[in-house]
Amino acid sequence: MNVVDTIKNAAFASAIQAALKYMDKDPETNIPKVMSIVDKAAPEGWYAGQRNAIRQGIAEKGNWYELATKVWALDPEVRKTFFTNFIVNASLKGSALQKETEEKEDCNVPWAILLDPTSACNLHCTGCWAAEYGHKLNLSLETIDDIITQGKKLGTYMYIYTGGEPMVRKKDIITICERHPDCEFLSFTNGTLIDEEFCQEMLRVKNFVPAISLEGFETANDGRRGPGVFEKVKHAMQLLKAHNLPFGISTCYTSANYKDITSEEFYDMIIEAGALFIWFFHYMPVGNDAAPELMPNPEQRTAVYERIRAFRSSKPIFSLDFQNDAEYIGGCIAGGRYYLHINAAGDVDPCVFIHYSNANIHEVSLLDALKSPIFQAYRKGQPFNDNMLRPCPMLENPECLPKMVKETGAHSTDPQSPEDVQHLCDKCKPYAEAWTKMADKLWDERLDAKK
């Protein structure tokens, strides 16, 4: 039986569920039994390295063990739903169906779909690329429901809300969670609209996780987002922690804040607040009014790269670095390879940062959008660089995106101020040239370390 058939096999899903029951009874004692069940049920070679790393981390009772105990302290029903939806449905069953669909249809099929429920926001943050879309666009409840229904048929069970501020649509977000209890939903949010009532709704539906945006400490955060926002975020985190609900932090690193958000003090603050993960994003000069000077220089990006990796081996929090972690997933993940983005107007973009498209979800099916010219160009071009520290066709390889956009006839999907693709990528050229030397050095060191 091949990997796809094994993962789709009901016995494999049953083995995972049995493992979770063991953990519920006595997590510390039964972890070895759980690993044994997974080993016996898994296809040969399936995530072998990761399974060994988990085993080692648990045996040493270090930061990964501490993180595991925090996960097991979550509300039991929320935890059970997360493991079922995220591990069994999205990462096992879903991945197998994605692979099958990809081979059959000759197109990328995403592990996750990013959606903008609305372009509206209750804040007016300085330099926000999402603000380029204005505040009047919305995907209807039925459109979101239909996208997810289509996505599940392709094998996609993970959905991530961006914006705008998704929590402006709190009621509809909960309705979607109810309609699709087999999916896991994550939302990037400024956190100011999370209250006691919404926490109770999260406990009820069980399949929603917020990723709260923080730009650093109070001065930096409120300087960009407005006075009092930091305190509102702290209150939201206190509520989530009190209800044993999972949440994480999202942060954009720039030349101005990179030291603060990779400091031990910042890490310790969010860990104490109850965050289970932190997702780092590199500042992208998207939009006609972007500020290229906020892009970190090579030394600053390297500092971020090194600090995140250091804390991965010492802090009980899962750290993701969107730009510097490409080696773990083979380069650029956009264009439907692992994810795509649908904005509040329905335009299907290859990336949340790259707003050029041939398709609108109101006019074509999700599958047809994945077969559209710009998505096929991504499929053909990936990876855009053999150096996994230079994954993006815009930021690190600015010669690639204009070529794809022009050859496919894709148009700008920014309704407020459409940006010419050459204008966008010209802003990235000095950065790419400066980063290449450092990236090559770091990548060579990384390859040598693996030998």
Set out the residue ranges of the language-model regions.
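Radical SAM enzyme [4Fe-4S]-AdoMet core and its adjacent flexible, acidic
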Residues: 1-52, 56, 222-335, 343-345, ...
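Flexible mid-to-C-terminal extensions adjoining Fe-S/redox cofactors in radical SAM and related proteins
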Residues: 2-7, 11, 15, 22, ...
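Conserved alpha-helical substructure of the radical SAM core
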Residues: 32-197, 205
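Short, charged low-complexity linear segments at domain edges
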Residues: 89-110, 320, 326, 360-377
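Short cysteine clusters
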Residues: 121, 125-128, 332, 346, ...
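A short, flexible beta-alpha/helix-coil linker loop
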Residues: 131-135, 217-219, 285-288
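Radical SAM/AdoMet-radical enzyme domain recognition
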Residues: 141-161, 167-281
